[in-house]
């Protein structure tokens, strides 16, 4: 026995003694050597476990420590949630509900995204963008604007434009799985009378269109012919689709109109507060037969449109087609 070794008596269960005996024989060493080795290893093992545990905690904390990317993404996410909660339908919307909507199993990780502790995957960010009507390029990479303004010209073919306004968007899975419930035609209260069209789905997703149309006399020949077509399109929508899709028209100040066009606000935060003003219904309709004065110059424009709408042969051919009611590109 070494001078440094200390002898002491240890009472152990008989079953444990038998296991030590068997292990000593298997390892070809004495019972004392076997017991000493196992005691020593148990302390080393505990030290190793502590080191591994420390590494796990360190990695966990590092993973949840804010980085510049996490901070930027969290700022965007909090902006999106803030804008969404300004809308009546979403004013009590929570991160947990958002996590459920995008098929997360729990809300724990989603809440960590908003605190800049974890970074969502690109796929998760794309789902959030779809469910909140946000521009994915902005949410993922900070490019463009938070809300996409689609600068488009109507095709000026009824079938195509009815599909554009009333049909679901086949290029977006979330939109394609929902139906359009409402269309808003918003005219700027200005001399030119620019136009924004909002296409609102049953799931409250929204698409924003900004066609180069002026609802006014501030038009060249081509622009005025496009305005006549626009009147034909809206008359068809009101005649055949209003029972399935709500069609509203509004007037909006220049300041608020331009704010929507910046793409920095959710359009419904402004549009849902507007009152319905039926200028779309009345612009190419001779009834009611009285001045309506929706804006300065409305009644003069209306009189001109009524005259030219009736004089355009191709418009009258379409509008008076006895089979027009059968030519619906959208089925509900």
Set out the residue ranges of the language-model regions.
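DNA major-groove recognition helix of helix-turn-helix/homeodomain DNA-binding modules
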Residues: 122-138
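Long, charge-rich C-terminal accessory regions
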Residues: 162-295, 299
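A short, Lys/Arg-rich alpha-helix, primarily the initiator
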Residues: 1-5, 52-101
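Short, basic amphipathic alpha-helical segments that act as recognition/interaction helices
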Residues: 29-50, 145-146
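Charge-dense, extended regions
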Residues: 275-332
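Short Lys/Arg-rich basic patches
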Residues: 1-16, 21-29
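Short amphipathic recognition helices of helix-turn-helix/homeodomain-type DNA-binding modules
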Residues: 39, 138-157
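Recognition helix of helix-turn-helix/homeodomain-like DNA-binding domains
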Residues: 7, 101-120
């Amino acid at each position: 026995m070494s001078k440094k070794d200390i002898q002491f008596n240890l009472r152990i269960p008989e079953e444990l003694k038998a296991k030590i005996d068997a292990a000593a024989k298997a390892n070809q060493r004495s019972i004392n050597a076997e017991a000493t080795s196992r005691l020593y290893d148990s302390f080393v093992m505990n030290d190793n476990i502590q080191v591994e545990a420390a590494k796990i905690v360190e990695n966990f904390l590092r993973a949840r420590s804010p980085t510049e990317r996490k901070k930027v993404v969290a700022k965007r996410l909090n902006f999106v949630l803030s804008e969404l909660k300004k809308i009546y339908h979403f004013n009590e919307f929570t991160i947990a509900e958002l996590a459920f909507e995008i098929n997360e199993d729990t809300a724990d990780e989603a809440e960590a995204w908003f605190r800049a502790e974890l970074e969502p995957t690109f796929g998760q960010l794309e789902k959030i963008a779809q469910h909140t009507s946000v521009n994915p390029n902005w949410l993922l990479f900070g490019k463009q604007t938070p809300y996409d303004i689609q600068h488009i010209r109507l095709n000026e073919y009824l079938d195509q434009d009815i599909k554009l306004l009333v049909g679901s968007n086949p290029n977006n899975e979330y939109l394609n799985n929902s139906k359009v419930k409402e269309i808003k035609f918003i005219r700027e209260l200005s001399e030119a009378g620019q136009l924004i069209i909002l296409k609102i789905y049953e799931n409250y997703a929204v698409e924003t269109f900004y066609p180069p149309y002026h609802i006014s006399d501030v038009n060249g020949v081509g622009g005025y012919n496009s305005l006549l077509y626009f009147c034909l399109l809206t008359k068809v929508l009101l005649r055949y689709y209003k029972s399935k899709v709500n069609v509203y028209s509004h007037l909006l100040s220049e300041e608020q109109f331009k704010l929507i066009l910046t793409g920095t606000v959710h359009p419904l935060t402004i549009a849902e507060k507007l009152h319905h003003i039926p200028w779309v219904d009345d612009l190419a309709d001779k009834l009611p037969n009285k001045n309506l004065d929706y804006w300065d110059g409305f009644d003069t424009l209306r009189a001109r449109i009524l005259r030219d709408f009736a004089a355009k042969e191709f418009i009258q051919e379409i509008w008076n087609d006895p089979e027009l009611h059968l030519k619906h590109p959208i089925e509900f």
